[in-house]
């Protein structure tokens, strides 16, 4: 079911945690959101683009724009489907518990899984709650694989980097930066150009 919407790449991530200080350093000190690159003065640059996201995480890299905004109709639609989602935004733990207790892999399960994927990986908010901004993209599950999730991840990461001085918090998929750097650093200086092509 998850693979049917082209999100199977997220099931193959073997990394349960990331080095927080290192990831924050890459995000705050090295990532240039305007150029969409990790910049290391005197050593080179590593492009971080929607194509990078597609190659690393195998998510959809073409299609329509992912709507990530507060939409009353979408909020009402999602709340009407789940007893646990009423009033304020549900906690991530609540949705995870709902998934654990689910007896069938149906649309409700898939929608809940996507809420978790977006709120913990693709575009984690600064709180421990599911952001209702993700609801518009999840109302019609048949359209999920027709959206450009790679572009969405990059746009959210770049937006977070631009606003980093205004908010004392880090959001966005910084694991992308860690993996991009790791792929680059595993190559020797002799394959500098090849390492850039990988990304």
Q: What is the predicted role of each segment?
A:
Residues 35, 45, 62-63, 83-199:
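Long, internal protein-protein interaction and assembly surfaces
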Residues 1-107, 114:
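N-terminal leader regions that mediate targeting or early regulatory function
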